[in-house]
Structures are given as C-alpha cells and as structure tokens.
C-alpha cells in the first residue's frame, strides 16, 4: 500500500476534534513520524474544558479512535469510523510489525518504578533482539520539575531511540510530549499511550477478548480498579452522551473555536 497523504486522508469530526478514519493496518504502514494521540470518552470530555490539551490535539499528526464505544456511536454519523484501535493493543502490533527492522529503536517512559524496565525486558525477549533501547519510570509529579524533565530528555536522546512511548496518563503525557518533542530531534514517532507499559510488563491484564469485542473492556477495567476508575466511567464520561447528542442535533458548539 502506498503511503497515505495527509491531505488525502479522511477525517471524522467528533465534538471538537478531527479523528483520522484509518484502519490498524493503514496506521502501521504509515506511522513514520509525528505525535500519536488516541481519543476515548475521557479525552473528549477533557477536551471540552482544557484548552492546553485541546491545543496539543490540534498539533498532533495522528489522532486515532481508541474507544470501542466511540466507534459504535460513530456509526450514527454520516461517515462512521472504520475501526477502533486501542492504543495498548496497537503498540504490540507496532513493535511486532517492526520486529525485523533494526532501525526501530524504542524508549519506554512511564509506569511505577521497575515496571518500564520489566516491559522492556519482555518486549525484547518477544522480538528476539534489543528493540527497546531504554526504559525509565519518572517520579510522581515529575512534569512540574523542569530539572527532572530536562534529565529525561537527556536520557532519551542518549539512548538513540527514534520512537518514544510515554505512558503517564492523560492529559499529562500528551502535554509533556508536545512541550519537549523539539528537544528530542532523534525521536521521529511519539506515542501517548496510557497504561500500555503496565500491560506490556504484565502487571496489568487486558480484558478477555470477548469483553474487548463487545466494547466492554472499560467495564472489565473498572471492576479491577473501582476506586480509580468508577468516577471516571460512571460520572465524568457520562457527559459525552450529552455533548454527542448535541452534535447529532446540530447544536454542539466548540468551546475553543475562534469567533
């Protein structure tokens, strides 16, 4: 398949963001550079209130549907979304797609102490060589400390990585990438992928395939981590249906659109 031209790519407008209407295979074949963000319901709610997060989305080269629920609701639009591409499973697809590419060098940034290193070990064992060239678990609140952020930039640069996965939660990971991307010229692909490092390390289990297939992975995760996720899924994310209903009725207004 020929590389897709950005100006020829189809986009689906959901609330105030444009989502690339792309399949997993198309993304694998065309993700050569840029920032990848993966909107889900939680992101879409934050994007109604957080201008900095919204600006990051506008500057990101790849905006891909992460949510099965968003994918299903997208069927109500004139041009439905082709495929939901959960970031956690996409990353596995990405390194397996590039497993024979000696030029693909990945750095993992995120998760709790020791987990990123464990993920690095497992991935390298799976692909049979040192594809992941570095891993680091930053301190809690690291993004508020410029000296630590600059040290992280130095570590990534010295690793020789050209792919950086940041998994410290949204919107922190997306904002951090956009703030520091220009200081890491060797990195061509930036991925903001939440709990992916934990999944790769085996410290967090993905939902069984049947739960994923029917769009209920979010419920499975909530059952596993109710204290952390109940409010997000059953209170905060419910706002999406209000906003999406307004879009279907043609009365939704982008809170950040210039007058």
Language-model region placement:
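Proline-aspartate-enriched helix->loop->beta-strand connector
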Residues: 156-165, 169-170
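A transmembrane-helix-recognition feature enriched in membrane-embedded lipid enzymes
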Residues: 69-76, 206-259
């Amino acid at each position: 398949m020929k590389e897709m031209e950005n100006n020829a790519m189809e986009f689906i407008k959901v609330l105030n963001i444009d989502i690339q209407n792309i399949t997993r295979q198309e993304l694998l074949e065309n993700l050569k550079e840029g920032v990848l963000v993966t909107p889900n319901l939680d992101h879409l709610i934050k994007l109604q209130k957080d201008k900095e997060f919204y600006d990051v989305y506008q500057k990101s080269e790849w905006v891909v549907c992460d949510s099965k629920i968003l994918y299903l609701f997208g069927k109500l639009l004139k041009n439905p979304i082709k495929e939901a591409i959960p970031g956690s499973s996409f990353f596995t697809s990405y390194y397996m797609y590039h497993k024979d590419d000696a030029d693909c060098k990945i750095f993992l940034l995120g998760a709790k102490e020791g987990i990123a290193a464990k993920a690095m070990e497992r991935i390298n064992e799976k692909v049979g060589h040192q594809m992941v060239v570095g891993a680091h678990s930053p301190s809690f609140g690291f993004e508020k400390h410029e000296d630590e952020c600059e040290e992280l930039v130095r570590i990534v640069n010295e690793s020789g990585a050209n792919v950086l996965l940041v998994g410290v939660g949204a919107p922190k990971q997306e904002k951090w990438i956009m703030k520091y991307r220009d200081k890491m010229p060797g990195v061509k692909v930036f991925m903001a992928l939440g709990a992916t490092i934990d999944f790769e390390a085996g410290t967090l289990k993905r939902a069984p395939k049947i739960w994923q297939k029917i769009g209920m992975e979010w419920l499975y995760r909530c059952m596993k981590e109710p204290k952390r996720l109940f409010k997000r899924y059953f209170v905060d994310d419910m706002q999406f249906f209000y906003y999406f209903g307004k879009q279907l009725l043609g009365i939704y207004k982008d809170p950040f659109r210039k007058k």
